[in-house]
Amino acid sequence: MRTTFQFTDGWKFHRGDLDETNYRAIHANRFKRAEWMKAGNHGISRVGYPDETWHDVDLPHDFVVASDYTPTANAVHGSLPTDVAWYRKTFELPAEIRHQRIHLEFDGIYRDATIWVNGHLAGSHLSGYTSFSLDVTELCDPNECNAIAVRCDAQEFELWSYEGGGIYRDVRLVATDDLHVPYSGTCIRSTFPDEADLSKVQIELQAQIHNAGREDRAAQVTFKIFADTGASPVYESSQAAPIAAGTSTAINHRLDLSQPTLWSIASPHLYRLETHVQVADKSCDIYHSHFGVRSIRFDADQGCFLNGESIKLKGVCNHQDHAGVGVAILPTIDEWRLKQLKAMGCNAIRTAHNPPAPHLLDLCDRMGFLVMNETRLSGTSPEFLGQLQALITRDRNHPSVCLWSLGNEEMLIQENAMGAKMLQRMQDLTHRLDPTRPCIYSANCDFNNIAENFVNNGFQIDTFGANY
């Protein structure tokens, strides 16, 4: 069964890079850095590494905000110097999860992060804003103490505003059965066959089921839909799902729901989906997802309609930093900020200019805000398309999300053929991952030339964004 542990307490922190990464490493007498020479050779991430002089910290943690202001640091980044930093943590696996698969989920590290466990490379992640998960099962010792080390390099900027540095969002350790729903593994789509009749909605459910074991499994997948706080399901359905060893299978189900309670700004009602995976009488996984039922559309002449009613979007560009804590934002801070915005008449948020913390979207779902969810950079490299895909697959179940933003003021490409083709490919990918929401691109400068360039190169953006 799935068990989730908050992995935020008891970390060690060192500011600055380390010239030597050896500790009881092979070839340590000949090289200062031998982590790429032998498996398990990364000393900083091994148990026993001397970190007594490192600082004790809890996550989320922004190490840049603790710096002294200096005129030599970049002013638009707060006149605070950035750096490379290291984090370390030792941990033991509780007895009840020692024979399960072990995953580490990171909501955000700024930036260019490399993660090591017990001397072994676990993974790397370039973006300072997208979330990711690592399966570290084989790297963990089920019976002994384990160690993790994270190196991040905040010296490169992604924005022209304060970005901080470090493991500045939540981290979780998640234990699962070999047979489980992977990270961001469900997709829930609500469509109305008749936009004029909101009493009947068609819901499409998809769950990815991954079998990390060495044997084929004859699974049973059950979808249960609840009102958010309800104890009894309003809908339930089961189906057989044979999953071959070492593979993932998408389980799809479609249902009609009558008289749904709609999600709206004034009444943000949520539903809860439980995806149950079992084999014979053994429960292998229960994966929780929240979603809302609502219709939203944009009309060039009449504007935005939510659940068939015309609304005005009264929004703000929401940069994630806050006084005193930098980018290490707790949900309580974002909740306070949203309450102030709600009192001012605000009903929409733009995640300027990057993927947000997951908790911000949870709050917008529950507090009744619409969200323009923005990827960090326009591009068609595997890295930038991967960032866009990670954003959409993580966030597409949130009813608050109403627009996918493909970029912001990309002055070098927005008026030429290359840019139109790049944005077209990004929009095509977005439509495949989520055909229920429109895309937007936030243009600046000469809107007429930009629009003409799009049309001349065969690109039709779903919603045209004009900044200034």
Model regions and ranges:
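Accessory carbohydrate-binding/adhesion or oligomerization-edge regions at the termini
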Residues: 1-69, 147-153, 228-230
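Accessory beta-strand-rich segments of carbohydrate-active enzymes
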Residues: 3-5, 12-18, 62-66, 76-190, ...
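Short glycine/proline/serine/threonine-rich loop/turn segments at secondary-structure transition edges
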Residues: 97-101, 140-145, 216, 257-272
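Beta-strand-rich binding/interaction modules
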Residues: 117, 199-241, 249-253
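Exposed aromatic-hydrophobic patches
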Residues: 131-138, 248-256
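N-terminal carbohydrate-binding accessory modules
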Residues: 185-186, 274-343, 362
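Short, solvent-exposed loop/linker segments at the N-terminal edge
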Residues: 190-201
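Substrate-binding/catalytic cleft of secreted carbohydrate-active enzymes
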Residues: 338-343, 348-468
